[in-house]
Amino acid sequence: MGRGRVQLKRIENKINRQVTFSKRRTGLLKKAHEISVLCDAEVALIVFSTKGKLFEYSTDSCMEKILDRYERYSYAERQLTATDPESQGNWSLEYSKLKAKIELLQRSQRHFLGEDLDSLSLKELQNLEQQLDTALKHIRSRKNQLMYESISELQRKEKAMQEQNNMLAKEIKEKEKTVAQQTHWEQQNHGLNTSSFLLPQQLPCLNMGGTYQGEAHGARRNELDLTLEPIYPSHLGCFTT
């Protein structure tokens, strides 16, 4: 006689219920992971215990992405099946869904900030660590890219300034050379004019000076002759007597 199907019902014993929940939860998360890997399916699993503790699993840790996809799909289905304006949405249900989504996002944010980690299992902590490592890699990559771009821009500006300085130095050197040549030419022209002005000229006074001295000597001699003429006979008279 075959074994009959066991009727499922709530376990009354609290300890047994907690043990069964722990075992079935582990198996459920494992099955969700297996179907995600084997069938390449996007799986999102959310479980709340009787104490309100959250347990979740999502393919590649993309719970928000899967929930967004679910919301879009559900909205499209409701739009297709709606027959009148009154059946287009239950605002109360929408509010509950949005509230649950906000709570999930806030909880994920606290986890990323290192808060409320006591409720996470080892697998969930490993997934969180992997997400943080991936985020850090992206942040470091972006930071290095910005630093490289900044260094490249500074090098480009430095090269442009160096080229400009070289051009200015060349212009200054050419101007100094021109000024030096002009100064040299002016000095040469000034030296030629000064030399021609200072050359001695032959003056007639030199010859005239010699004539003047000869004439003066002759005149003085004549005076002496005139002076000696009256004296000479007297001397002669003395000698005769």
Swiss-Prot record:
Signal peptide interval: none
Domain K-box, first and last residues per copy: 88-178
Entry keyword set: DNA-binding, Flowering, Nucleus, Transcription, Transcription regulation
UniProt xrefs under Pfam families: K-box, SRF-TF
Sequence ranges assigned to domain MADS-box in this UniProt record: 1-61
Cross-referenced InterPro entries: MADS-box/MEF2_TF (IPR050142), MEF2-like_N (IPR033896), TF_Kbox (IPR002487), TF_MADSbox (IPR002100), TF_MADSbox_sf (IPR036879)
GO molecular function per UniProt: DNA-binding transcription factor activity, RNA polymerase II-specific; protein dimerization activity; RNA polymerase II cis-regulatory region sequence-specific DNA binding
Expressing tissues: Expressed in tendrils and flowers.
Compartments, record wording: Nucleus
UniProt-listed SMART domains: MADS (SM00432)
Domain of life: Eukaryota
Keyword Transcription in record: yes
Primary localization class, coarse: nucleus
Annotated transmembrane regions: none
One cellular component term from this protein's GO annotations in UniProt: nucleus
GO biological process, any: floral meristem determinacy
Function, as annotated: Probable transcription factor involved in flower development.
Name this polypeptide is given: Agamous-like MADS-box protein AP1
Source species of the chain: Vitis vinifera (Grape)
